[in-house]
Amino acid sequence: MYRKIEKLGFIVSIIFGLSIFTSKAIQNLSGSLLLLLMFIMLMMNVKEKKVWNNLKSKCDKEISIGFLVLLLLTFIVFIINFDGKTSMARDITRYLTFFPLIYFIDTEDKIKKFLTALGASGVISLLAALGIFIKNYNVWNRTDGIVFYRVTFGMDSLAYAGVISIFMIFIFSFLFFMKTTTKEKILLVLLICLGIFILLVNRGKTAYVSFIPALAYLCMIKSKKALLMLLLACLVGFQFLPTQIKQRATYIV
């Protein structure tokens, strides 16, 4: 029975990974199902505590404490603002999902499959956003007033910029620190170009105040030369950005 639940848990984990950048509804449903499966396993083995001990052995102590702190902060926010009840429930579900994911994705092969699903989700999202940009280019291209059309997919523009920034950090990490073939490097570079383009046409502040500092940190770890190249790319590249993007940048400060 345990094996069947573990197998089902891994399948749901893959679905969860595929939905991260593509569907909030499926993400919430699969995340809740993961928690339910984890709860069932804990209850079935409540006396022997085998599942609980396995979970503790697989979780990094410091990271687990970090997630528990996030849960505590969420409760504090809820106490201050009672109107955020629904939002709090979603946040708690997302934070707690970390633990069943750690339990069900417990081998190198499973990790690779989950990362593949996560990457596929990001690629689908970027391509969909590109299609939306092409379809609505005339609206995006308007420069009158201070209301700017922002490209997004499946969520509000601010949240989308945030998740794509996180996805891009993963892609840069693979490029900088993982051993990859020439074809894989080309694919990663193409994804980086597409991701940066989507972040720019999204016209959100996230690309400037979150993504760039995080990327600068990765470059600093990689080498001083990489960090210098990033700074030059930002300074020089900004001068060549279209007016439609530069105008949005003036509202960041």
Language-model segments: which ranges?
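Alpha-helical transmembrane segments of multi-pass inner-membrane proteins
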Residues: 16-17, 75-76, 93-96, 112-142, ...
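Flexible juxtamembrane loops connecting transmembrane helices in multi-pass membrane enzymes
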Residues: 149, 239-253
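Transmembrane signal-anchor hairpin modules in multi-pass inner-membrane enzymes, especially those
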Residues: 1-82, 109-119, 175-186, 225
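Juxtamembrane membrane-interface segments at transmembrane alpha-helix termini
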Residues: 42-52, 101-107, 127-134, 203, ...
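Aromatic-anchored transmembrane helix interface
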Residues: 63-72, 82-106, 122, 126
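Membrane-interface amphipathic/re-entrant loop segments adjacent to transmembrane helices
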Residues: 86, 135-148, 152, 252-253
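Membrane-embedded alpha-helical segments of multi-pass membrane proteins
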Residues: 25-47, 88-99, 160-168, 208-216
